[in-house]
Design a protein with these regions (language model features):
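Acidic/histidine-rich catalytic cores and adjacent linkers
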Residues: 50-61, 67, 100-215
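Glycine-rich loops and low-complexity Gly/Arg-rich segments
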Residues: 23-27, 37-42, 49-52, 79-82, ...
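RNase H-like nuclease fold core
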Residues: 1-61, 65, 69, 158, ...
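Conserved beta-strand -> loop -> alpha-helix junction used to position metal-binding or nucleic-acid-contacting
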Residues: 54-100
């Protein structure tokens, strides 16, 4: 499940059956999605007797914890993307470059190898991450390498949910939301042709798109 947006004030939240590639539930959004929006969709599935084997989601703060009763997989693609946003495409430090290489292996390796590489990286750079710089104007200290810290601790914080698919091999849980990403990309491409469409007609277009393609 994931949300996609057109600007800040219009989006749609989707829940898709990853293996049947079937749209199960959707909700139009007029603002940033909340945990309550996702829980509304989960409750709808429960009310309609769907068996929830697992849930793949992105990094909305607190969402994995709110879904603790289920097997939750944090989308590995979103995690790599988040690290890239912190480090940029061209990290300026050796630590950042090494961490970027490790992050890019996330979707292509196993749990033990990845966690081992990340632990070795921290053993090498952990003290470096603690460096602080004094701001002479304010007299306050801040972390010198904040972006690299944020990238590392983002992976560390989500580690519990990055390998659910691996920890439960008998449960068919994808490791990414790539199916939803493909749907969102296709939908946005088609809507781009009709740029300038009002919100009302955009909703009608999206409803018809899903009716025809994912009925």
């Amino acid at each position: 499940m994931d949300a996609t947006y057109w600007g800040r004030n219009f989006g749609v939240l989707l829940i898709v059956d990853a293996y049947r590639k079937r749209l199960l539930w959707r909700k139009f959004l007029d603002k940033k999605e909340t945990i309550a929006d996702y829980l509304e969709g989960i409750e709808w599935l429960r009310e309609h007797k769907f068996k929830i084997l697992g849930i793949v989601c992105d990094g909305l703060w607190g969402l994995p914890q709110a879904l603790a009763q289920y097997k939750v997989q944090y989308c590995q693609f979103h995690q790599v993307k988040a690290v890239g946003e912190y480090l940029t495409k061209n990290p300026q430090t050796d630590a950042g470059k090494e961490l970027q290489r490790i992050a890019h292996l996330l979707c292509h390796t196993d749990k033990e190898s990845f966690t081992g590489m990340l632990e070795m990286w921290y053993e090498k750079w952990g003290e470096w991450l603690k460096h602080r710089t004094l701001d002479r104007k304010t007299g306050k200290k801040s972390y010198t390498h904040q972006r690299v810290r944020s990238a590392y601790f983002s992976m560390k914080r989500h580690m519990k949910w990055l390998w659910t698919w691996y920890d439960y091999p008998d449960t068919p849980i994808p490791n990414t939301n790539n199916i939803l990403e493909a749907i969102n990309t296709d939908l946005k491409t088609k809507l781009r042709i009709h740029n300038g469409m009002s919100k009302r007609y955009r909703k009608l277009f999206i409803d018809e798109y899903f009716r025809l393609k994912y009925k």
